[in-house]
Design a protein with these regions (language model features):
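Extended alpha-helical coiled-coil "stalk/arm" regions
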Residues: 39-73
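Short, charged, amphipathic alpha-helical segments
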Residues: 44-47, 51-52, 77-81, 103-108
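Extended aliphatic helical segments
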Residues: 14, 18-19, 26, 43-46, ...
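Long, charged amphipathic alpha-helices with heptad-repeat/coiled-coil character
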Residues: 26, 32-43, 95-123
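Short, charge-rich amphipathic alpha-helices with coiled-coil/heptad character
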Residues: 2-38, 82-90, 115, 119
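Amphipathic, well-ordered alpha-helical segments in soluble domains
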Residues: 25, 53-56, 60, 87, ...
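Short, glycine/alanine-rich amphipathic alpha-helical segment
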Residues: 59-100
């Protein structure tokens, strides 16, 4: 009888350890999800700041070009404006790619978390 009780206690201990391990895995995944969400916020901040900078630079180009009237300068300022907008598009595209990668990571992490939770429910 004592052997049966000892075995039951060992089994309970093993089960408790497994549950504890799964909870720890879930907490780690949730931390990684939060970290990825912070990355998304930083990407949005970078994009907002870059767009504001781009608008300011375009406005400066506009002001300078309106004060200096010569064909040569007009072309130069137009080239600057085009170059500035091209750079904005490149940065925006790069940030979009980063955002997509982070969103994919978040989706995978949620999937991994669900898998662990489902396995835990099956074994209960």
């Amino acid at each position: 009888m004592e052997n049966i009780n000892n075995q039951e206690q060992k089994n309970e201990k093993v089960a408790d350890n497994i549950i504890s391990e799964r909870k720890q895995q879930i907490y780690q995944i949730e931390d990684r999800i939060d970290s990825e969400k912070n990355k998304l916020n930083k990407i949005s901040d970078i994009e907002d700041n870059f767009i504001a900078l781009n608008k300011s630079l375009n406005r400066c180009i506009e002001l300078v070009s309106s004060s200096v009237k010569s064909k040569k300068n007009t072309y130069m300022y137009e080239d600057m404006r085009i170059s500035n907008n091209t750079l904005l598009n490149r940065v925006s595209n790069t940030l979009d790619e980063e955002r997509d990668a982070v969103n994919k990571n978040i989706k995978n992490l949620y999937s991994e978390k669900s898998k662990i939770e489902d396995e835990a429910k099956e074994k209960e």
